[in-house]
């Protein structure tokens, strides 16, 4: 008996590393020292910093993985993984330098897992950081067939004097919301429960009544087919495709805006807990934010979730990003220039509120 008899194929692991080397190489930066395969990844700090501060972040993509696995579509979930980490690091004003991933599965499926790594590499390219290394763990008996889990780790850098920590935020500063691409990577346990309870049974009934075989999968429905206010491409999008839309990565447009002269007093990544939980994290003591929820459009997926699952509006805002994936706090006299900048960078931006006196709350939301 050997390790392979126990369910761990060492040669398959070696072959997998060789498959992904070219993907990793596409993300390299000049500061990377050495290649893939060492015991540790080495990275030389960029020059020009007087008091460099390293900023770290770790995250996953939650049960969005279940949808990717159900649809056998693995090429974008890696982008989500990178986005969740680099957007967090960005809120401190830091430039992401490098990224590491942890991928665990019961059995190595080379095609699917190569797609996952390709997505991670694409996310790193979007963020401008190097995929410095990672770990692929084959653990037979630990995960069901076809399932895997992901975790990501990112390190960024910022000048100490330029680090954002809430102390720069002033009363009267304005909140600028950067549009999300959809649900991003939070709230999927609620989404899956809604699909299981309300859409799955209906799809099965239609299939049993002689409808197309595709309707066996609730992810194939097109909830927006009758929405004449939407472009044709959106009306034709399936539920599964909408839910697998990758999380927006805000690193390059935000850092470029900052380097072009925009003053940023604070930033918030809108993840689990939505605006009410995440926006106060970038404020100072005695501050709240007054928002106008009518000042930005929400992607149609949120209307569908709310109506199909009878989810109260307050609960929607407490769970999802509701169309705003990242928030910037800027001085009032820079709002217009900031909006112009982001809207010319294919990063839709909206003036959504103002910093007011308070106890760390988000005011103005329904409920």
UniProtKB/Swiss-Prot annotation:
Record's keyword annotation contains Signal: no
Top-rank taxon: Bacteria
Gene3D superfamilies cross-referenced by the UniProt entry: PurM-like C-terminal domain (3.90.650.10), PurM-like, N-terminal domain (3.30.1330.10)
Residues making up the signal peptide according to the UniProt record: none
Catalytically driven reaction(s): 2-formamido-N(1)-(5-O-phospho-beta-D-ribosyl)acetamidine + ATP = 5-amino-1-(5-phospho-beta-D-ribosyl)imidazole + ADP + phosphate + H(+)
Gene Ontology MF terms in the entry: ATP binding; phosphoribosylamine-glycine ligase activity; phosphoribosylformylglycinamidine cyclo-ligase activity
Pathway(s) per entry: Purine metabolism; IMP biosynthesis via de novo pathway; 5-amino-1-(5-phospho-D-ribosyl)imidazole from N(2)-formyl-N(1)-(5-phospho-D-ribosyl)glycinamide: step 2/2
InterPro entries noted in UniProt: PurM-like_C_dom, PurM-like_C_sf, PurM-like_N, PurM-like_N_sf, PurM_cligase
Entry's Gene Ontology cellular component terms: cytosol
Residues annotated as transmembrane: none
Alphabetical UniProt keywords: ATP-binding, Cytoplasm, Ligase, Nucleotide-binding, Purine biosynthesis
SUPFAM superfamilies per record: PurM C-terminal domain-like (SSF56042), PurM N-terminal domain-like (SSF55326)
UniProt enzyme class: ligase
Pfam families: AIRS, AIRS_C
GO biological process, one term: 'de novo' IMP biosynthetic process
EC number: 6.3.3.1
Subcellular location: Cytoplasm
Similarity annotation: Belongs to the AIR synthase family.
PANTHER family assigned: TRIFUNCTIONAL PURINE BIOSYNTHETIC PROTEIN ADENOSINE-3, TRIFUNCTIONAL PURINE BIOSYNTHETIC PROTEIN ADENOSINE-3-RELATED
Protein name per UniProt: Phosphoribosylformylglycinamidine cyclo-ligase
Species: Cyanothece sp. (strain PCC 7425 / ATCC 29141)
């Amino acid at each position: 008996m050997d390790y392979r008899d126990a369910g761990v194929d060492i040669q398959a692991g070696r072959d997998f590393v060789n498959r992904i080397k070219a993907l990793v190489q596409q993300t390299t930066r000049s500061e990377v020292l050495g290649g893939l395969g060492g015991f540790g990844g080495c990275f030389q700090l960029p020059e020009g910093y007087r008091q460099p501060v390293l900023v770290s972040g770790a995250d996953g993509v939650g049960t969005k993985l279940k949808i990717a696995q159900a649809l056998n579509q693995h090429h974008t979930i890696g982008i989500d993984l990178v986005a969740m980490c680099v957007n967090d690091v960005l809120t401190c004003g830091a430039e992401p330098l490098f990224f590491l991933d942890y991928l665990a599965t019961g059995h190595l499926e080379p095609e699917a897992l190569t797609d996952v790594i390709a997505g991670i590499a694409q996310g790193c390219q979007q963020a401008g950081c190097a995929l410095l290394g990672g770990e692929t763990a084959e653990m037979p008996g630990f995960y069901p067939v076809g399932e895997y889990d992901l975790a990501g780790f990112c390190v960024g850098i910022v000048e100490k004097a330029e680090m954002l920590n809430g102390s720069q935020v002033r009363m009267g500063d304005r909140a600028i919301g950067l549009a999300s691409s959809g649900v991003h990577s939070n709230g999927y346990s609620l989404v899956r429960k809604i699909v299981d309870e309300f859409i799955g049974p209906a799809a099965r009934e239609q299939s049993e009544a002689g409808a197309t075989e595709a309707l066996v999968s609730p992810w194939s429905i097109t909830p927006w087919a009758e929405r004449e206010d939407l472009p044709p491409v959106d009306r034709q999008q399936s539920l599964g495709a909408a839910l697998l839309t990758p999380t927006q990565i805000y690193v390059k447009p935000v850092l470029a805006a900052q380097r072009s002269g925009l003053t940023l007093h604070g930033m918030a990544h809108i993840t689990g807990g939505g605006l009410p939980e995440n926006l106060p994290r970038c404020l100072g003591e005695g501050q709240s934010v007054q928002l106008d929820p009518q000042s930005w459009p929400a992607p149609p997926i949120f209307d569908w979730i709310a109506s199909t699952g009878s989810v109260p509006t307050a609960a929607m805002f407490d769970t999802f990003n509701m169309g705003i994936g990242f928030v910037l706090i800027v001085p009032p006299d820079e709002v217009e220039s900031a909006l112009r900048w982001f809207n010319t960078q294919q990063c839709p931006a909206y003036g959504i509120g103002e910093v007011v006196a308070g106890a760390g709350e988000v005011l103005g939301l329904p409920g």
